[in-house]
Amino acid sequence: MSKRLESKYKINRRLGVNLWGRAKSPVNKREYGPGQHGQRRKQKPSDFSVQLMAKQKLKGYYGNISEKQFRKYYDEAVRRKGDTSENLIDLLERRLDAVVYRLKFAMTPFAARQFVSHGHITVNGRKVNIPSYIVRDEDVIEVREKSKHLAIVLDAAQSGERDVPEYMEVDHRQMKGRFLRAPKLSDVPYPVQMEPNLVIEFYSR
């Protein structure tokens, strides 16, 4: 298991937020970060630290994306027409592992990434094992036939912790979903407040 995947248990504590809204999150047990033995006196954060925190939250939410890859999403968001913040969210939500997570084929973004990497997902009938693959409008995402009865898939589909967002549709009996349209920030069911505008400010310094 990669260092990036191992860090998932520390992300919530380090950031001090329950990124995925899960009941078992370590942040529900203590509010201070890993390696700390109590709360430190809070100081007013600088603009830089606020922007950095916004970036770390967004990166962490999508499975702790590498800095190099996350910067590429920012560059592409700037290149596209329209609101850069909305463009960034759209790109992140179109990642195949993010779509698999949203469709409730996996319990966490980390599990979704592994599920895609291990070849359990098809897009428009073709196997795709690249988690960062960008899904387009009307693409059909399906769990491969041999994988539809795996416990991890069934457990995720039956979980009541999350709902499938309106910009996607899913049939859990067939384990098949469709990406319908570009999401707006207000459409995305983040359990915590995300501030992509601060991420844009961080990179445009």
Swiss-Prot record:
CDD domains: S4
Gene Ontology CC annotations of this record: small ribosomal subunit
Gene3D superfamilies per the UniProt record, alphabetical: Ribosomal Protein S4 Delta 41, Chain A, domain 1 (1.10.1050.10), RNA-binding S4 domain (3.10.290.10)
Transmembrane segments: none
Gene Ontology biological-process annotations: ribosomal small subunit biogenesis; translation
Annotated stretches, region: Disordered: 26-47
Family matches, as PROSITE patterns: RIBOSOMAL_S4 (PS00632), S4 (PS50889)
Record-level Gene Ontology MF annotations: rRNA binding; structural constituent of ribosome
Keyword vocabulary terms for this entry: Ribonucleoprotein, Ribosomal protein, RNA-binding, rRNA-binding
Domain S4 RNA-binding: 94-154
Purpose: One of the primary rRNA binding proteins, it binds directly to 16S rRNA where it nucleates assembly of the body of the 30S subunit.
HAMAP family according to UniProt: Ribosomal_uS4_B
Family (UniProt): Belongs to the universal ribosomal protein uS4 family.
Quaternary data: Part of the 30S ribosomal subunit. Contacts protein S5. The interaction surface between S4 and S5 is involved in control of translational fidelity.
Protein name stated in the entry: Small ribosomal subunit protein uS4
Organism: Gluconacetobacter diazotrophicus (strain ATCC 49037 / DSM 5601 / CCUG 37298 / CIP 103539 / LMG 7603 / PAl5)
Organism lineage string: Bacteria, Pseudomonadati, Pseudomonadota, Alphaproteobacteria, Acetobacterales
